[in-house]
Amino acid sequence: MDMTSTAEAAARSWYDSPRLGGGGSSGGGNGGGVSPQTNGLGSAGSSLAHSHHSLSSGASSAGSSVGVGSALGGGGGSGLDTSDMSAFYALESNGHHRRYYPSYHQHTSRMPSTHASPQVCRPHFHTPLSPWLTSEHKSFAPASAWSMGQFACPQEPQVEHKLGQMGQSHQTTAAGQHSFPFPPTPPKDSTPDSVQTGPSEYQAVMNAFMHQQATGSTSLTDASCALDIKPSIQNGSASGSSGSGTTHTSTPKQREEGRECVNCGATSTPLWRRDGTGHYLCNACGLYYKMNGQNRPLIKPKRRLTLQSLQSAAKRAGTSCANCKTTTTTLWRRNASGEPVCNACGLYYKLHNVNRPLTMKKEGIQTRNRKLSSKSKKKKGLGGGCLPIGGHLGMGDFKPLDPSKGFGGGFSASMAQHGHLSSGLHPAHAHMHGSWYTGGMGALGASSGLQGGFSTAGSLSGAVVPHSQPYHLGLSSMGTWRTDYT
């Protein structure tokens, strides 16, 4: 058995001994499941727990070492001496270290927090923090966020005393240890933001911090000490300043409720303005007063008819078209002689240089709809596409099939002339297309009438025509024949 497994077994038996009700008797009652070495460690763990409890009450570390040695000797266990058990009580000989090793720290998390036995394992704190940790009413006192965890460090006695007093008001009934190496999350009701520090406490912490900064130490312990003290200082000062400066005066705008425009009597407006005497005006009256220098009139004045407008209205009242004699039009125009004419007659004369005939006169005025209707949009959308099949081939080329003439009787003579379109590629291609027309379809089992219908195409395929003739027309004609007659 190597040393690691032995140490883990010893740690398990040492922490489980309070629940089993003793060391030697419980080990003996197990039968053959527990070795004598574990039995001895069980009794040693029980004595260790008693000596550990005496430590929290004020006993010295030397007494605990003697107690452990006697317990190991009385247990009769072989294989471990006093030096091997240094992992359990070496932490108590040095008051500056307050953390467990990770393997033993996991075992402490298994202990129930509400255990009422006096042998419960308590956290390792040194003497200045013991007055508020050894309370008679709580079997397991919680640790504060500033003095527990792997990153905790030794601090000045007066600083720890002040921190202990601050932690007394935020204690909880039970707080279990975390099985992680980083510091545990503080309780909800004892977060650093909720801690209120007085002037004297703040001054004591500040003096300790300045003393540590003056030493100039660059070790990791001093650096972590600064981390421990700084949050309490910053949060305390922030809470003190926020407590004195958070006096929110959320009073509604009661003065605006009783305002009324002195000109129009309006009680609600986007923006209240003032006139020259300081009275309130609504936005409209205020703008009018600013632009015109006088109060805004409450009644909109009627449009004043000038002499010129009266004369023009009188002239237009008896105006009639010199051509069609109509009196209603959307626009009055003048002819070449200067006589007034309606819009229709004036446009007609402008376009044709002839007076508009009276037969075209209409009683109603026809207005032009400038919005495109859905039908006109559809018609415009069809334009610009490919020509229909009638653009390539005459509709007379397609006739009903005549069963008496075979399959090829449905084509006219002009249909066969389209075979020359395939010869616009190359002489070799023309020969290939000619063989397709004359012999290709015959090989597929077509009748003699089909071959006779394409005989002209076969004879024309040998001639070479210029390459300027479109090739896609021949392909499209054959594509339409295949889709329509297969």
Curated annotation (Swiss-Prot):
Pfam families per the UniProt record, alphabetical: GATA
Region (Disordered): 1-65, 161-198, 232-260
Ranges annotated as biased composition (Polar residues): 166-176
Biased composition (Low complexity): 40-65, 236-251
Record's subcellular location: Nucleus
GO CC terms, sorted: nucleus
Compositionally biased region (Gly residues): 20-34
Keywords: DNA-binding, Metal-binding, Nucleus, Repeat, Transcription, Transcription regulation, Zinc, Zinc-finger
One of the protein's GO biological processes: animal organ morphogenesis
Transmembrane segments: none
Predominant subcellular localization, coarse grouping: nucleus
Gene3D superfamilies per the UniProt record, alphabetical: Erythroid Transcription Factor GATA-1, subunit A (3.30.50.10)
CDD domains: ZnF_GATA (cd00202)
Tissues with expression: Expressed in procephalic region at embryonic stages 6-10 and in the posterior spiracles, the gut, and the central nervous system at stages 11-13.
Molecular-function GO term, any one: zinc ion binding
Zinc finger residue ranges, GATA-type: 261-285, 321-345
Protein's UniProt keywords contain Zinc: yes
Function: Transcription factor that is vital to the development of multiple organ systems. Binds to the core consensus sequence 5'-WGATAR-3'.
Protein name per its UniProtKB record: GATA-binding factor C
Naturally occurring in which organism (per UniProt): Drosophila melanogaster
